[in-house]
Amino acid sequence: MTASTTPGVWQDLAQAIHEEIEAGADGVVVMHGTDTMQFSASAIAFMLETPVPIVFTGSQRSADRPSSDNVMNAVSAVEAAKSDCAEVLICMHASESDDRCALHRGTRARKNHTSRRDAFETIGADPLGEVDYESEDHEITFRRDYQHRGEAELDLDPDLETDVELVKFTPGAGPELLEAVDDAEGIVIEGTGLGHVNTDWIDHIEELVDAGTEIVMTSQCLDGRVCDRVYDTGRDLLDAGVIEGENMLPGTAKVKLMWALANTDSVAERIRRPMAGEITERSVPVE
């Protein structure tokens, strides 16, 4: 079960992929369980600069079932690994039909259904591309710009700070939740709406930040951007030292914080700066 995946597994995987590309691989396919695929794909995207495609895939239904998606997903992933898109992708069914596989950026994907074959979605947009499984040559199309094959130099930065926690705020939750993780090097909070928590949390957050803990605010909303400058609570959170996570998915933000804590002294700046498509451009310019 991929629920048993650890950051050490991500590091071993990144090293193995790096070795294959260094040895001349023109693309890499990673067969992975679906439950934590988005976390592993995000980790590889942050740890590894790649000049070739790295494609994660798996199956929602086992090979002994007539509705298994394993062959189609695997074939489509191989085609994606032969493409010009040198990014970390997730390749899974685009619908319940056996016609197309979607190509999601690993840092923007989320498993949104427990059992459907098209469980994965790109949050906030259509998938980056798709593989037409029914066409004779499994034609691949892309909807948006991407990093082209050969544009990046192969580079590996596998260090991770594993003492990072993800805390979900809910109405009535007290700051005791933070006390349970106050020894962590970093904390990602899933706040409400634009990135809010109860005002009772703010003093404790400030104490943690003053003690050296990096705290990143994300939103429980599936789409949209954190903005803590709109309401008093948000401004107080910024004054307390919270880092806005822009529109990163909470799980992706946790993985990025793990990477940033281990690889840079400017954690806040690195969190706010896009690295692997995890933060998208604003649809409306902000002055």
Please give the residue ranges for each predicted region.
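A short helix->loop->beta-strand "cap" motif at the edges of active sites that frequently abuts
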Residues: 50-53, 86, 208-214
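Accessory alpha-helical/coil subdomains and C-terminal extensions
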Residues: 102-186, 284-287
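ATP/NTP phosphate-donor binding region
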Residues: 1-20, 203, 266
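Short acidic, glycine-rich surface-loop motifs adjacent to enzyme active sites
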Residues: 22-37, 183-194
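Short beta-strand segments
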Residues: 30-32, 55-58, 89-94, 168, ...
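Internal gly/pro-rich beta-alpha loop/helix module
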Residues: 57-135
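Short Gly/Thr/Asp-enriched flexible loops that form oxyanion-binding sites at enzyme active sites
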Residues: 30-52, 200-205
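C-terminal non-catalytic interaction/assembly regions of soluble proteins
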Residues: 194-287
